[in-house]
């Protein structure tokens, strides 16, 4: 059986159009089915450093789905193959036991305290 790698495409950066808050992700990650991948999200002290991080999965033609909230919590129905962590101004999404259905866009998101009025 031939295993072809999955390509997990990622948002390169999340920005508010009226703000200068940027979260940086790698452009893509690929791995074979059954393997593990980690997806990084880098920010600053005003966003990731002092706020909770969420992760979203967007399959082609569908709305984004919440995978992780409050850094490492999973909503009901999200398998434990998905995990989140945060350290300093960076966050990571881990996916174990990759499946073909995991091929999607993945987004990190957080609040930026510097945008508070």
From Swiss-Prot:
Origin superkingdom: Eukaryota
Source species taxonomy: Eukaryota, Metazoa, Chordata, Craniata, Vertebrata
Region (Framework-3): 73-108
Domain Ig-like: 20-117
Matches recorded under InterPro entries: Ig-like_dom (IPR007110), Ig-like_dom_sf (IPR036179), Ig-like_fold (IPR013783), Ig_sub (IPR003599), Ig_V-set (IPR013106), IgV_Light_Chain (IPR050150)
Cited function: V region of the variable domain of immunoglobulin light chains that participates in the antigen recognition. Immunoglobulins, also known as antibodies, are membrane-bound or secreted glycoproteins produced by B lymphocytes. In the recognition phase of humoral immunity, the membrane-bound immunoglobulins serve as receptors which, upon binding of a specific antigen, trigger the clonal expansion and differentiation of B lymphocytes into immunoglobulins-secreting plasma cells.
Protein's UniProt keywords contain Secreted: yes
GO MF entry, a single one: antigen binding
UniProt-annotated stretches for the region Framework-2: 53-69
GO terms under biological process: adaptive immune response; immune response
Framework-1 as annotated region, ranges: 20-44
Coiled-coil regions listed: none
Protein name: Immunoglobulin lambda variable 1-51
Modified residues (Pyrrolidone carboxylic acid): 20
Cellular localisation: Secreted; Cell membrane
Record-linked PANTHER family: IMMUNOGLOBULIN LIGHT CHAIN
Gene that specifies this protein: IGLV1-51
Gene Ontology annotations for the cellular component aspect, listed alphabetically: extracellular exosome; extracellular region; immunoglobulin complex; plasma membrane
Signal peptide segment: 1-19
Subunit details: Immunoglobulins are composed of two identical heavy chains and two identical light chains; disulfide-linked.
Disulfide bonds: 41-108
